[in-house]
Amino acid sequence: MKQENSDPIQVIIADDHVLFRAGVKTALSSKKDVKFIAEADNGMHLLTLLKAVVPDVILLDIEMPIMTGINVLPEIKKLYPSVKIIMLTMLNDHSMVTQLMELGANSYLTKDSDSEVIYEAIKTCVEQEYFFNDITNKALLTNLKEKHNVVPQHLAAAEVVLNEKETTILRLMCEEKSTKEIADIVD
């Protein structure tokens, strides 16, 4: 959480597309509680910048030359664990979302996200650690289901062998006999 509510959230944007960086900065320029303090065009450049200035939030592109966002993410989290990282991409790939969250990302947004969504993600990551949207929710739930679709051995249904009496009771139940009728037939 921010120490002072009056201090703007300091943001670095790392993306190899100059126009995208400029567009995000322009779209959020009216937000007085967000201040862009630097920008980088690749992961290596970003690591160099971080030696001089550490932001509250990094908007990090996944696909960049020299060092990708995927490669630089764990390095940033190791060196600067308090920095919140919002991954930006054109990809809406569930397995990618899960991988990035496991590497330490605090949110995942597609580049076609509205500027208000980006703003909300920045604020929420600072205030609450993570920002989840439909993309992240679906991806994480899908991955969780896939990981837990395997039934543990001790819970797996074992082959059940019924004795003659149990088989008769089951057959009578299927024939919709009453409990009294079943009891009379079995005894």
Locate the predicted segments by residue.
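Conserved acidic segment of CheY-like receiver
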Residues: 7-20, 24-28, 58, 162
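Active-site residues of response regulator receiver
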Residues: 15, 61, 89
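Short hydrophobic/Thr-rich beta-strand motif most characteristic of the beta2 strand and flanking loop
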Residues: 33-41, 49
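Acidic catalytic/metal-coordinating carboxylates
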Residues: 42-45, 68-71
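Active-site beta3 strand of CheY-like receiver
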Residues: 53-59
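Receiver (REC) domain active-site loop signature in two-component systems and cognate sites
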Residues: 64
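Short, flexible helix-to-coil linker/hinge segments that flank and couple to helix-turn-helix
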Residues: 96-101, 107, 112-160, 168
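Helix-turn-helix DNA-binding segment
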Residues: 152-187
